């Protein structure tokens, strides 16, 4: 099945500590999770690796969030929206269910 949320989509968080925040999808994982820019930040304790020039310390990075907890953001309506699929000129395209506009990739 085609993915409803893809890389570089603008999404809004529906649940969790970052509810209501918007961000861009940087990675879609096969486990049904997405990594969103600036959302779900966690602190990771990085061990130093002098051979590779990696400095140790506490670093902040984005953790994965379940795809069910995000929705694509429709700029035309200014709200979260649902995605549908249809065929246009023999190609399968995504569209917003609220206003029928196609999603630009």
Swiss-Prot record:
Domain of life assignment: Bacteria
Gene3D superfamilies given in the database record: 2.30.30.30
Molecular function via GO: rRNA binding; structural constituent of ribosome
CDD domains given in the database record: KOW_RPL26
Keyword rRNA-binding carried by entry: yes
PROSITE patterns noted in UniProt: RIBOSOMAL_L24
Key words, A-Z: Ribonucleoprotein, Ribosomal protein, RNA-binding, rRNA-binding
GO cellular component, one term: ribosome
Residues of the signal peptide: none
GO BP annotations listed: translation
Annotated family: Belongs to the universal ribosomal protein uL24 family.
Function: One of two assembly initiator proteins, it binds directly to the 5'-end of the 23S rRNA, where it nucleates assembly of the 50S subunit.
Description of how the protein assembles with itself and partners: Part of the 50S ribosomal subunit.
Protein name, entry field: Large ribosomal subunit protein uL24
Gene giving rise to this polypeptide: rplX
